[in-house]
């Protein structure tokens, strides 16, 4: 439902504070404060969490080199070293942990049914993919210039949300006249 997508979007807005608890990064006499790290992390909000960590790691390395600490210490600071340290500051390490946390925090823990360990039901694929795009990122199709979606009434709002993440191009959505994604809520062109 649209309400479910709205719940996911609200959760995604809170996610930076839930998933990342930065501490000071120390390398020799150099220190990047946790507060500064969080500001950099938030500055890259349009990127997935994993990419943000890498970008912040590069910022820390650049700051280290700029402050000329490298010359005094003599040891080079590698982006990979910083990224690994930042990764350890994540409170949830993968999309499945984030997906479980979403259901826990929204009070819908009983809605998440996992038939086997680390196995989701089909109904969970698109919501999981939607969150995965925020955590790990998804490969966007740059080759697709226009996406045509037929039988629109067979898709749920969360499926459309996930498709929008994967295909950031223009879309044409087709369906039979009088059929709706949610028959209990009519939308106009103004919506």
For each predicted feature, which ranges?
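Conserved helicase NTPase catalytic core signature
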Residues: 2-146, 159-160
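Conserved helicase motor core of SF1/SF2 NTP-dependent helicases
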Residues: 107-112, 132-146, 151-191
